[in-house]
């Protein structure tokens, strides 16, 4: 039994997101800007909220590059998301270089409005996974995997070191220190469009304090935002994982049951109080069921055959059946 936040480790491993900053950026004394301007981090956060960006743009694209302490590139990534008929669609692609110590080579992910499919390739294996969202968790999870700026963090003390104007753009330098750490911190340099308060670029450098007291650079991650590019996934991962009900491919027929709303009140809903869904997935696909509550998985209606979370649902055969029980209902 694991929470949905812990279940999405695979999907989140490529999304080392931006850290935020706090404080005001007063520019009224800068003669290089024609009109006096005051900017706060709260205003930046509101302008760059992912839902706010989708209200102003058809698509949002984020590119990422991570360098190690020696400035060697370890990872590059591209994220893109849009909104179609009130559903957020998204995809990302991460590449790991020979300088990376992660053991991975590439990761693709695609979210289609209700599910999220991912394909991970490492030096020795290829893994497929499918995240199935229950109780309206889809949109929030998908948005959480996409870099945002500035992000809201707890237990971090943030200070604005400088704010200036250059070539018609605002440059904001921030230092953030972890309150629970004895010397670890990161710095952020934001480049902002003063007309919209949208962050155009951000460079985040992490520093770590060693036992000797020496502080050294850990890595630097650079982010760049662009808008209204054509929405086009680099790889259609969903089609590699999920198949239509009338397809002829040799796949696994997965049936999963979930307590239907109202069943706890004795209402006649679904099959004996269960809602049932049927999908067809590629053999060997790791299935993740995500919910706001912890979940228990069972292979039988009587709930006597638990499915180990780490072993997961066995999709190697012709069919598989899962009964999903939220923890508070699991008596």
Residue ranges and their predicted role:
Residues 1-8:
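Bacterial N-terminal signal peptides that target proteins for export
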Residues 11-19:
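Bacterial N-terminal signal peptides
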Residues 18-89, 163, 235-249:
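N-terminal leader/targeting segments and the immediate start of mature chains
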Residues 25-33, 196-257, 261, 265:
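Non-transmembrane domains of secretory- and envelope-associated proteins
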Residues 78-144:
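An acidic-aromatic
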Residues 132-205:
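Extended beta-strand-rich segments in extracellular/periplasmic secretory proteins, especially
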Residues 285-306:
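Surface-exposed interfaces of beta-sheet-rich extracellular modules
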Residues 314-330:
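Conserved "repeat-terminator" motif of extracellular CCP/Sushi domains
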């Amino acid at each position: 039994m694991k929470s949905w936040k812990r279940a999405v480790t695979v999907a989140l491993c490529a999304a080392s997101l931006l850290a935020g900053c706090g404080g005001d950026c007063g520019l009224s004394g800068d003669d290089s800007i024609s009109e006096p301007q005051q900017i706060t981090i709260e205003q930046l956060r509101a302008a760059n909220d992912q839902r706010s960006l989708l209200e102003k743009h058809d698509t949002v694209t984020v590119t990422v590059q991570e360098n190690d302490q020696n400035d060697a590139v370890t990872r590059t990534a591209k994220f893109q998301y849009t909104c179609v008929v009130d559903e957020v669609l998204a995809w990302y692609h991460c590449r790991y270089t020979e300088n990376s110590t992660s053991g991975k080579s590439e990761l693709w992910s695609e979210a289609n409005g209700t599910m999220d499919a991912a394909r991970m390739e490492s030096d020795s294996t290829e893994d497929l996974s499918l995240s199935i969202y229950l109780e309206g968790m889809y949109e929030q999870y998908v948005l959480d995997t996409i870099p945002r700026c500035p992000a809201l963090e707890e237990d971090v003390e943030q200070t604005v070191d400088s704010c200036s104007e250059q070539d018609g753009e605002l440059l904001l330098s921030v230092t953030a220190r972890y309150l629970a750490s004895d010397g670890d911190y990161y710095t952020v340099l934001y480049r902002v469009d003063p007309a919209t308060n949208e962050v155009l670029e951000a460079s985040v450098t992490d520093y770590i304090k060693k036992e000797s007291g020496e502080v050294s650079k850990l890595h630097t991650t650079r982010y760049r935002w662009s808008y209204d590019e054509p929405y086009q996934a680099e790889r259609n991962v969903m089609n590699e994982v999920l198949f239509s009900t009338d397809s002829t491919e040799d796949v696994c027929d997965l049936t999963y049951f979930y307590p239907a709303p109202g069943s706890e009140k004795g209402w006649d809903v679904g099959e004996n109080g269960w809602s049932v869904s049927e999908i067809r997935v590629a053999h060997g696909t790791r299935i993740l069921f995500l919910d706001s509550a912890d979940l228990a998985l069972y292979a039988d209606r009587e709930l006597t055959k638990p499915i180990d979370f780490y072993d997961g649902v066995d999709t190697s055969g012709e069919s598989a059946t899962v009964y999903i029980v939220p923890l508070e209902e699991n008596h």
